[in-house]
Amino acid sequence: MEQPIVEFDNHYMLYITTFDDSNNPTGTYFYSSNNKLNEIFDNISNNNLNTNSHLENNARITDAKSDEDNDGINDKIIINYETSNDGIIKAEKKDIKLIFFLKYRLIKQVKLIMTPMIYLDIPILDKGAKNIKLNGDIELVQKSPIISTTITSQLYNYENPFYDIDTKLNSPFDFYYYYNKYKNLNYTLKYNYEKNEQDSSDKLGINIEINIPKLQRVFYIQSIFETIKYAWMQYFYIFLPIYIILYLIYKFIIESNIFYSHVKSDL
């Protein structure tokens, strides 16, 4: 068990749908950290003359981190989304979907590097500006044990991750495919959070606090080299009590003269 090393990866996708009182969609807003994807969404909206689809240029996403015990490993990551878009704020209802990515590393007992996805679906059921706070812990979810090796297991590559969508997405809505694909992986990250909602003056804000566990439980299988490396210790602890018992029996036989000997000593 060890504390994972976690950082914000600065990649995100935001998709907001607004509704009227009868739950009819009135608009869609999209924004991401990928300029190519933003262009695709903008072109789709303009070519289809869909005045209800908008690129959410007012979106502002920032992040911060906290190392409470000064050990060089983040204990908390904070991600903030904020907008002053009237079309979103004044809508009767809205549904906010936010996907962002983290960098996650284990380096001691097992060596694991991955770029996990966090998917949030946040409904807001009334009108007006809001401050929404999410606070929770991340949890490593495993469908199978990790094979412990001396080579780092790269589930995703930082330089060419699966969310590098320049050549993989034909529309902004295809990210559902990648999210469903991500959910089926052997190792994923789950964000267990509580939600608190308050009225605000003029902006819609989402504050996401991610607490990083001090000890992350990991299920893994030892490699054959690791097994051989520590096998002699197991044999030693098994044969040590047997050796002590045999020695005590031998000592008892000698001291009790159970077997007579013809060896004569001049001492």
Regions found by a protein language model. Give the residues of each.
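Long, compositionally biased interface segments
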Residues: 182-267
